[in-house]
Amino acid sequence: MLLDTGISLRRIKTGLARRALTPDDLSAVLITHEHSDHVAGLPMLLKYYKNVKVYAPQTVAHALERAAAGLEGRIVPIPVGESVALKNFTLTAFPTMHDTPESVGYVLTGKDARFGVCTDTGCVTAEMLDALAGCDAAVIEANHDVNMLRAGRYPVYLKRRILSDRGHLSNEACAQLACALAKTGVRSLVLGHLSRENNRPGLAERAVREALDGEGFSAVTLRVAPAEGDLELEVTPCCASN
């Protein structure tokens, strides 16, 4: 499966090739929302790989179908809160708080483990916490350091957008989310969607690590997803026996 397609088809193919895969091997492409940094590569992917099926929130799915002909049966709308079967997994969408008509995170449930993804949200809601609670591993957003953003070169309107409840999570907000998830049993976290302009991996990791340790969750594994290259994550049940 591929989550979002915000990069070019060439980069998608290069990334898959590092895993000895091609786009033809994809069972599904999951789309979280319609911003270009999440869908820019989708038109070319769908044009050249006719067997690729896309799963997206309803508003995004309908927009994709209107934008291009010949996609009937290849775009699958996922109503928020409902689940669909994908081979040996169950995919569930939950709403995030972002400045688009509709944006979602996903939880993928297999036979023995659950994996969640939650980025592009300006705040954390009870519904999001409920969806991610007890996941064995999750990717969560640590988009910006507030001081870097405020002192940076972004125009005022963009800073306000990012800092709003429909923008992106700061390192501090991410730390609060991490602790809340740790209380539900989540034991492996990956920080993602870091701004190149307004954050640094070390800043994000330190903010979240200190918060987790301060709340007694030093056993939680914490990693930062790189902007380039791979991060391999093995998702295993938290309660797996030795």
Model regions and ranges:
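Active-site metal-binding motif and surrounding structural segment of the metallo-beta-lactamase
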Residues: S8-A56
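Metallo-beta-lactamase
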Residues: P57-G105, T109-D112
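Conserved beta-strand hairpin/beta-sheet module of binuclear metal-dependent hydrolase folds
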Residues: M1-R19, V104-D120, A137
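Active-site environment of divalent metal-dependent phosphoester hydrolases
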Residues: S36-V39, H62-A63, T100-P101, C123-A126, ...
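Cap/insert and terminal regions of metallo-dependent hydrolase folds
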Residues: A126-V224
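Active-site neighborhood of phospho(di)ester-bond hydrolases with catalytic His/Asp-centered motifs
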Residues: L3-G6, L26-E34, Y55-P57, G116-T119, ...
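Metal-dependent catalytic neighborhoods of phosphoester/phosphodiester hydrolases
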Residues: A40-K50, L64-A67, N199-R206
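Short, basic/aromatic-enriched C-terminal tail that caps enzymatic domains
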Residues: V220-N242
